[in-house]
Amino acid sequence: MLQETHLRTNDLYRLKVKGWKQFFPANRQEKKARVAISISHKIDFQRRNIRREPEGHFIILKGRIHQEDINIVNIYAPNMGAPRYIKKILEDFKKDIDSNTIIVGEFNTPLSIMERSSKQNINKDIVSLKNTLDEMDFTDILRGFFIPKKQNTHSFQGYMYHFQR
C-alpha cells in the first residue's frame, strides 16, 4: 500500500518492470498526493471492482486471490477531522466489509496509548472511532502482533486492520 504518492507515468513503468504489474491509484492527477494499491505479479489477483475517492484519500479494491474473495482498503485521512472522516468511510462501506477485508493506511489519529504523548488528550471523535472499530470487530494486526510495547515509533500512525467474524 502506498501513501502520499506523486507518481508520474514513467514511474509506473519502472514499477511494472520491477514486478509490480497491477497498480491501482486512487486518482489520476499527478500533482496531488494520493493513495494507491500495488500488487506483485507473483500473486494471482483478479480485480472485480474498484472504488476511488476523487481527492485520492481512499481506494477500495475488491478481487480474488487464489479463488478467495478479498477487499483491500487503503485510507489516507486528512490532518483535520481524521477520526470523523475514517468513521464515515467505514460506515458508508459497512455492507461491503466482510471477514476477508484488510484496511491499511495513515489515519492521522492516535488510536493507541502507545502513539500518544502524555500531554495528548483523547477527544470524543477518537473515542467514537475506536468504538466503531470495536463494534465492527476489527483486529489491529500491527499493534496486536508486531509492536507489543511502547517503542520509539516517532509519529507513525499507520494502521492495518483485519475484520473477523
Show where each model-derived region lies.
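A shared catalytic/ligand-binding motif for oxyanion handling
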Residues: 1-165
